[in-house]
């Protein structure tokens, strides 16, 4: 396990609870507690409302206090609602960590838990996810 020389939450644009939840998720990823079948950067939650991506897991481990999710109505009256954070309220660097706003074919959406751990550690340490480096592993 690497020593933690993380930037302060305020430097990262995070609240204390958001920071603490991301540190907890990092530990879970590095210990292999979040498996491939439980992780995808393509969505915040799986259709069954279990956590999926870094943002979803941070929300989950903080019992909903970090990156609070709000209901997003379905596209039609027959569509189910989805849940997501207030993306517009997040700093750019946090959006980049979560892979928000990318093209559906961006490699970040295929990241493994190990690659996500590398990007998350980079974000907490340097203030940038550095996905290209993480995905090269």
Task: Give residue ranges: language-model regions.
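Catalytic phosphate/metal-binding cores of nucleic-acid and nucleotide-processing enzymes, i.e., regions
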Residues: 3-135
């Amino acid at each position: 396990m690497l020593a933690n020389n993380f930037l302060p939450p305020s430097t990262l644009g995070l609240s204390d609870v958001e920071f603490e939840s991301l540190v907890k998720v990092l530990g879970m990823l590095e210990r292999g507690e979040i498996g491939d079948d439980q992780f995808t950067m393509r969505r915040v939650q799986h259709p069954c409302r279990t956590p999926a991506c870094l943002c979803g897991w941070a929300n989950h481990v903080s019992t909903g206090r970090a990156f609070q999710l709000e209901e997003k109505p379905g596209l039609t009256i027959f569509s189910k609602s989805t849940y997501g954070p207030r993306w517009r309220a997040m700093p750019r660097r946090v959006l980049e960590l979560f892979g928000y706003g990318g093209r559906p074919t961006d490699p970040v959406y295929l990241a493994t838990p190990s690659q996500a751990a590398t990007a998350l550690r980079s974000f907490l340490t340097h203030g940038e996810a550095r996905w290209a480096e993480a995905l090269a592993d």
